[in-house]
Every structure is written in C-alpha cells, then in structure tokens.
C-alpha cells in the first residue's frame, strides 16, 4: 500500500466518500455542510498543492479541492453517483442533484419537515430517498416527486436499491432489521 495524496479542505468530519472511476475524481461530504471534489488524473486542476513537511503521514502531496459545492444547511451525510448525477443528502432534510460533469445544481428537493435522510439510491433516471418510515421516488428527467409512500410500521429505512420497478429496502420494524422487496409496477 502506498499513499498517493492527502486531500484537504474540509473543516469538520467527513461522512461520505465516492471515487468516481469514470472521471478519476474523489468526492466527499462533510459535517462542514460542503461537498468537495478533487481531480486525481490532472492534479493541476485542483486547488493549492503543497508538500508535507515534518509530518507523520507517508504522503508527500497535499491537494486542495478542485470544486466545493455549497447549499446544504447542515451535515451532509450521504452521496450517490450515476453517470449523469451527483446527489447529496443532508440531515437538514434537503437533497441536491448536481450535474456529474459540471457540478451545476440541477434539482433541489427540500423536505425539512422530514427527519434525516438515511438512505439514497440514484440512477440516471430515478432517485429514491428514505427516512423514518418514508420512501420518496423522484423522476430526475423532470425533477418531480412521482411517488411518496409510508412504509407502514417501519421505524427506519436504512438502505434502498431500485431497478426495473423493484425496490429492496433495509428497514427496522419493532427493533427487528429486515429486507423488504417492493414491486412498483
């Protein structure tokens, strides 16, 4: 194992990371309310590059972020990535869909009346989010909420996966952890 870079910029804990294989970028989300993106193929595209001195780290290069995405008002805990979209979800109940190439904001979903978003699935067409007993399905072509369902009796939705009208949800019911398979056809 060899350390290649230290990616700097966040000012608080980092809660989610993604390596974008297609674009050769590292993406992270933090308690500091930001999403940061580093270009690992062309390091000159990033912010300041410095060299570690007198450091216990085996890495020599410290890279500043190429992009910093802002807009969430609280900890950003979840990230999702498709070919077209980078999606971020915050404990403030908001979801932001960014263009995966330009990082311009494409869609904003504000559900501040809900509790923290705990599950996220994104494809080029559909976004599914879950929180305490609630599933929301969005059409990412139109930016509209197309379905909102309460999972009766579910205390939490921990993870979701959606394909071809079938949703797999990891839920908690009465202190039991279960997988539920739901058909949306």
Curated annotation (Swiss-Prot):
One Pfam family cited in the UniProt record for this chain: WD40
Per-repeat ranges for WD: 9-48, 71-108, 111-148
Keywords linked to the UniProt accession: Repeat, Transcription, Transcription regulation, WD repeat
InterPro entries: G-protein_beta_WD-40_rep (IPR020472), WD40/YVTN_repeat-like_dom_sf (IPR015943), WD40_repeat_CS (IPR019775), WD40_repeat_dom_sf (IPR036322), WD40_rpt (IPR001680)
Protein function: May be involved in the modulation of rDNA transcription.
This protein's name: Regulator of rDNA transcription protein 13
Organism: Saccharomyces cerevisiae (strain ATCC 204508 / S288c) (Baker's yeast)
Organism classification: Eukaryota, Fungi, Dikarya, Ascomycota, Saccharomycotina
């Amino acid at each position: 194992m060899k350390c290649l870079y230290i990616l700097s910029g966040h000012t608080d804990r980092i809660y989610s990371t993604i390596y974008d294989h297609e674009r050769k970028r590292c993406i992270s989300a933090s308690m500091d309310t930001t999403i940061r993106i580093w270009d690992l193929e062309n390091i000159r595209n990033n912010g300041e590059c410095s060299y570690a001195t007198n450091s216990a780290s085996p890495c020599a290069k410290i890279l500043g972020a190429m992009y910093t995405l802002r807009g969430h008002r609280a900890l950003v805990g979840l990230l999702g990535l498709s070919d077209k979209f980078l999606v971020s979800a915050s404990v403030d109940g908001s979801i932001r869909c960014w263009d995966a190439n330009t990082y311009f904001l494409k869609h904003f979903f504000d559900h501040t009346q809900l509790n923290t978003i705990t599950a996220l699935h994104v494809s080029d067409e559909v976004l599914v989010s879950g929180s305490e007993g609630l599933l929301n399905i969005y059409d990412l072509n139109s930016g509209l909420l197309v379905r909102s369902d309460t999972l009766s009796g579910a205390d939490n939705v921990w993870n979701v996966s959606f394909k071809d009208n079938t949703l797999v949800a990891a839920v908690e019911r009465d202190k039991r952890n279960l997988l539920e398979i739901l058909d949306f056809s």
